[in-house]
Amino acid sequence: MFLTHLSLKNYRNYESETIEFANNVNIILGENAQGKTNMMEAIYVLAMAKSHRTTNDKDLIRWDEDYAKIEGKAMKKNGALSLELIISKKGKKAKCNHIEQQRLSQYVGHLNIVMFAPEDLNLVKGSPQVRRRFVDMEIGQVSPVYIHDLSQYQKLLQQRNHYLKMLQTREQQDETVLDILTEQLIPLAAKITLKRYEFLLLLQKWAAPIHHEISRGLETLQIQYRPSVDVSEKIELSRIIEAYSEKFATIKEREIQRGMTLAGPHRDDIAFSVNGKDVQIFGSQGQQRTTALSIKLAEIELIFSEIGDYPILLLDDVLSELDDFRQTHLLDTIRKKVQTFVTTTSIEGIEHDIIKEAAIYKVHSGHITAPLCD
């Protein structure tokens, strides 16, 4: 798939900009704080209906304006795609091919994106929350049902935590409501756990050979899912439901004492190991970067295997974080099959062959030029 057109209105530091893109490589050139990352974020938000940089949608709206608007046109293997997202202080409205979407879960997944930015190194060395968010965003691109289940789970989790807090402070003493909330939570927790497990098995399948190649055959990557309940390769939904039921029965009194839900997908983690050693704890910076790069390249292949179309790749100021070998491997892998957006302050560090093929744009103070000539 290719993003051919992007229009921004009142988005971050962009007042009103429209730009046409090339199908291969698009290099966004400019000094820091001019709007390069904001444009990459806008493409990401157009696809995912949320930012990877902030959880507050108000941050996306230009100062002193009431709303931001992102419009995009893309070509997919099954035809043209038109997307529109309006972000206001009251919420978001989304349209796909000019039809308003009743839920954002219906909207996400039409345009598929893989983002690789310096902060993605935190996927390996950051908190479990970073890894859970990564998994949720990637599954959500190919499974609208997952987004809906996750949203329902988070609402029930909030209600359950609130009631546990009331039981803890003796504001409530009747545990009946807690039991009802637990019964409603368990099937959703089980479905999320199963989907994450299946996704990580696929990610392992694609990432391991990529990592092996990037490490010149010296390293073996393993991805291990660490959920709140035990899972195995032959796990079934009914068995996960049973495991959660037993878990919540066992920890009920402890949850009341703590005033919070102590098991569920919100407490999951993912571990990455190289040659049997945890990369987060024992890995060098080079191994952590190779792991992050392998996972991002695996995402591209995984999405293609699921939908039959390559996603769009966003490389936001990340090439400078990779050595020449990793950069060359990345660019050779994606060349001519994945539409790629690259932000940089200078084209000097980018391979000459890539520059020859690329459309180069200049960003300055929230304004984008047409493609530059060599």
Swiss-Prot record:
Lineage: Bacteria, Bacillati, Bacillota, Bacilli, Bacillales
Pfam families in alphabetical order: SMC_N (PF02463)
Any one GO biological process: DNA replication
Subcellular location(s) per record: Cytoplasm
Keywords attached to this entry: ATP-binding, Cytoplasm, DNA damage, DNA repair, DNA replication, DNA-binding, Nucleotide-binding, SOS response
Primary location class: cytoplasm
Function statement: The RecF protein is involved in DNA metabolism; it is required for DNA replication and normal SOS inducibility. RecF binds preferentially to single-stranded, linear DNA. It also seems to bind ATP.
InterPro entries (UniProt xref): DNA-binding_RecF, DNA-binding_RecF_CS, P-loop_NTPase, RecF/RecN/SMC_N, RecF_2
List of residues binding ATP: 30-37
GO MF terms held by the record: ATP binding; single-stranded DNA binding
Keyword DNA-binding: yes
Official protein name in the record: DNA replication and repair protein RecF
Assigned GO CC terms: cytoplasm
Annotated source species: Geobacillus sp. (strain WCH70)
Similarity annotation: Belongs to the RecF family.
Gene: recF
HAMAP family on file: RecF (MF_00365)
CDD domains noted in UniProt: ABC_RecF
NCBIfam families: recf
